[in-house]
């Protein structure tokens, strides 16, 4: 399970060091794709493969679903962390997420999100008041 907030820095070669506690879960390979709200989503390879296969199976007769699968496949990069736990983020991914040197990696239960630090702080400030309402509406009192 991916939980927590971490603040790694992007180096001059576009490499980001993944939080140490997640490296074992991602050692078998990972997939970096464009996420929501101009973040990047990082999935374990097996998890992403299962999601992509389900999306592809549903898309054969639906033009919107086919377009989504095309964009998903074209915007995804397979990575394997190096010995220091770093992955190289493509220029396209860095541009999409508007990544500066200071980044934030957050756990989103079954995947990670990579954000530009300033964008993450703005997102939190903008949505802070909505958190309690969203929790109550979407989780119905579980928490």
From Swiss-Prot:
- Classification via PROSITE patterns: SPOVT_ABRB
Q: Does the keyword Protein biosynthesis apply?
A: no
Pfam entry (one): MraZ
GO MF terms here are: DNA-binding transcription factor activity; transcription cis-regulatory region binding
UniProt GO cellular component terms: cytoplasm; nucleoid
Keywords on this record?
Answer: Cytoplasm, DNA-binding, Repeat, Transcription, Transcription regulation
| Gene3D superfamilies listed in its UniProt record | Transcriptional regulator MraZ domain
- Compartments where found: Cytoplasm, Nucleoid
- Which cysteines in this chain are paired by disulphide bridges? none
Record keyword Transcription present: yes
Domain SpoVT-AbrB positions: 5-47, 76-119
Top-level division of the source organism's lineage: Bacteria
Annotated GO biological process: negative regulation of DNA-templated transcription initiation
Which InterPro entries does this entry report, sorted A to Z? MraZ, MraZ_C, MraZ_dom, MraZ_N, MraZ_sf, SpoVT-AbrB_dom, SpoVT-AbrB_sf
Question: What quaternary arrangement does the UniProt entry report?
Answer: Forms oligomers.
Q: What is this protein called?
A: Transcriptional regulator MraZ
Q: Which organism is this entry from?
A: Nocardia farcinica (strain IFM 10152)
């Amino acid at each position: 399970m991916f939980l927590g907030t971490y603040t790694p820095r992007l180096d001059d070669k576009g490499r980001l060091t993944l939080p140490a506690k997640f490296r074992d879960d991602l050692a078998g390979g990972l997939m970096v794709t464009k996420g929501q709200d101009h973040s990047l989503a990082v999935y374990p390879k097996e998890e992403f493969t299962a999601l992509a296969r389900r999306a592809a199976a549903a898309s054969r007769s639906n033009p919107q679903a086919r377009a989504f699968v095309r964009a998903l496949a074209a915007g995804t990069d397979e990575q394997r962390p190096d010995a220091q736990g770093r992955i190289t983020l493509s220029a396209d991914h860095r541009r999409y997420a508007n990544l500066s040197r200071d980044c934030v990696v957050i756990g989103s239960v079954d995947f990670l999100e990579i954000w530009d630090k300033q964008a993450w702080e703005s997102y939190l400030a903008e949505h802070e008041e909505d958190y309690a309402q969203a929790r109550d509406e979407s989780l119905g009192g579980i928490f």
